[in-house]
Each structure stands twice: as C-alpha cells, then as structure tokens.
Amino acid sequence: MKVTDKKIEGCQASITVEMDSTEVEEGLSKTYRRLVKKVEIPGFRKGKAPRDVFEKYVSREKMLDELVDDIVPEACQKAIQDEEIKPFATPKVAMVTTDPFVFSARIPLPPVVELGDYKTIRATKETVEIAEENIDTVVDQVLHQRATWETAERPVKMGDMLLMQVESTLNGEPYLNREDMQYSVREEAIYPAPGFGDCLVDMVAGEPKEFSIVFPEDHARAELAGKTAAFKVTVREIKEEKLPELNDAFAHELNPEFNTLSELRQRIRENMQDRQDDKAQAKFEDQIVEALIKMSKIDYPEVMVEAELDQIIEQQLQRLQSNVKSPEEFRAMLSQMTPEDMQQRYRPLAEQRVASSLVLGKLATTENLVPNDEEVDAEIEKLITDAGDKKEEEKALYNQSETRDRLIQLLTARKTMAFIDEIALQPALEAVEPKADEDEKTEEADK
C-alpha cells in the first residue's frame, strides 16, 4: 500500500491510496470466505464452492466491489497513521478505481482557533425601564383571561363571541360550511377571509346575511389569491365579554399572596423587568461573542457545521410537529419546504454556533476557566438542596459520567461568559499618543 497523493487545506486532509496486488489478493480471499457462505451455486452446498468457481459465478468485478468493505476501512486507518494525520472525525472514503485498487479519503482535521485581543472588547448593556403603560397592558390581558361571556340581546359588535351557521363557496366551489361555528369578532382576523368580521357587525340573531369578499392578489395562500368567497351567515347567539371589577379583591382572588392591587402591579413589574433584563443580557452577550469571533482567526472542518445543522433542523422539526394539530397538517407544512431549503435557511445559524463554541472554548482553556472538582461538587449540592430524602440518590445521578460532563460544560460556559462580560463592561480604552523619537526631541530642544 502506498499513498500516492496527500493534500492539507485548512482543516481537511485529502489522501489517495493505492493497494498493492498482494494486499488485494489477501483481501479477495477474505471476501470469498465471507460471500461463499451466502451465495448458492449450482452443484455445490452453500459455503463449499471453490474460489475459482465462485469467482467465475459472481464475476471478479463483483468481488472487487465487495472487497471495498473488507479492506478499505483498515487500509484507510493505516494510511492515516503512516502519514501522521490526526483525524477529528470519521473520514469520507470514495473508490477511484478497482483495477488498480485505488481509493481516496477526505479526513476532517481538528479546528484551529487563534484568539484576538479579547481584553479590548467593550460593549454596552441596555437598561430598560418598565413603564406604567406596559403594566396596564398586562393587567388588561389578565382581566380578559378572567372574563365571562353572557348572552347579549342586541346587534353584533366588535369583540363579541358568536355561534352561527355558515355556508360559503369559493369561485363557485364549496368553501366553508359549518352548522355550529363559534367565532370571535375581531378587526384583525383574516379567517375565513380578510374583513369577514367587519361584515358581521350590526347583524341580528336569527336574520341571515349574504355577502362576498375578494381575496387580495398578494394573499399568503396562493390558492386563495384573487378569488371570491360568497358567504351566507345566520347568527344564532351573540355573547358579550364581561370583565371582572379591577380592585384589591380581584388581585387577592388571582393570588392569595396579594392583598392589594398595588401588590399585583408590583409583581407584574418585577416579572417584566426580569424578562427585559434577560433579553438585554442575551443581546449584550451576543455582541461580545460576535466581536470575539470577528477579531479571532477560526478554521474548522465542514463536518462540524453539518452536525450542528442536522441538530438545528431536528429541533425545528420537533417544534413544528408539537405546534400542529394533526400529522396531515405537519406533512402539509413540510411539503412547502425541501430539505435543501431548510439547510440553506439554517446554515448561517449553524456556522455562528460552531464559531461561537470554538472561540469560547478556546477562551476557557486560555484563561483556565474550566471548573475544578470542588466547584462542580458545590454546584451539585446547590442543585439537590430541595431533594429532601432523595439527596443521595440525586447526587449519584449528577455524578454519573455523562451527566457530570454536561454540568462541567454548563459551568465552563457560565464562567467564560462572566469573565468576558466583566472585560466588556470596563471603561473604554483611551487612545495612547505615540512617543516622539529621541532625536526629534533633541532637535526641538536645539531650536
């Protein structure tokens, strides 16, 4: 066996390997012993046909094709060792020719990271104040959640809840037909057609109404764009929303911890402030990591992006599946986006995640931010504080190798971000004026 070509570009090595005739012959013997047990040849019991007869029966070309599985993995591994290549992941092997027996391999190499001057990174964290209007909006939402619905003996208004019979066609074909349809009358509603709610306003229970709506040419659903929907609607029941009275009693009913409405508003303020602070912190850290990536030199094998991309797409598909009502709806949504579309859409995110992971990992090792055993044990003690009688059982779970490794990764990430956060919040660096040359100083003094 000999390596006839070797190239290293970035984080990928490429080699071409030619097997000598002795190795090929030994491999064919191994292939024969494997296949002869599976192939029935007339005149011989299974596994008993001589090699020359067997090779004529299945053809030498077929034997060489099968030989790939028998000798290439081992030969590739030996070639990598002989060339002193340190692979980062499984090589991708491809046959070049079978006679002579030549294969090529693309070998991912470990990523390389050279950090920039991260101690010069500066960023500003946003400060968000919660306005009274923001609290009012949340309180209003809570009121609507606790509202009751009562029958109204009047024409339909915006905000009502209706029980109605709907008959309709779309360009003459059946569209939406329901005997008992519940419908919330909202200005912004676009179902079953834009402006449908407006057409219901002022209707009276028991009196049918007919109207038509033309879908806009730029409608999101192409199969509806430009078409005319003709409706016949009979409202059977009109219900109006009754909001509870906003007072101390409402606050206490909502949560016994609250004795006054002011306490409810204060809790809402605190919760909103926490969420806004979390958003500001996330945005702040995104800026820092982006700055660190831009100032650093990063090279990594494509396999890292592919693995991250697969994970992102899998997560997105799981999220999509959990948000739809039926397998049919899930398949319909999938049909609107090909695997290639998804890869193209999420590839930038995968690349960003890989780069982020690499620079932060390099920073952690450079500044020795990986937690020691004492720090990990202390974190486990915090996590099992409320475990009660199951503390020892919980501790044993956290100390399992895989779980403890994940905890170490979490603590490392936390310490690394805290380290770079502290740097970024320092005052801006002042520009340093260059010192004049000593000769220039002397000349100035002589003048």
Curated annotation (Swiss-Prot):
It comes from the Bacteria. It catalyses: [protein]-peptidylproline (omega=180) = [protein]-peptidylproline (omega=0). Residues 159-244 form the PPIase FKBP-type domain. One of its GO terms (cellular component) is cytoplasm. It is found in: Cytoplasm. Its main location: cytoplasm. One of its GO terms (molecular function) is ribosome binding. One of its GO terms (biological process) is cell division. Transmembrane segments: none annotated. The keyword Cell cycle applies. Pfam families: Trigger_C, Trigger_N. Its EC number is 5.2.1.8. Involved in protein export. Acts as a chaperone by maintaining the newly synthesized protein in an open conformation. Functions as a peptidyl-prolyl cis-trans isomerase. NCBIfam families: tig. Belongs to the FKBP-type PPIase family. Tig subfamily. Consists of 3 domains; the N-terminus binds the ribosome, the middle domain has PPIase activity, while the C-terminus has intrinsic chaperone activity on its own. This is Trigger factor. The gene is tig.
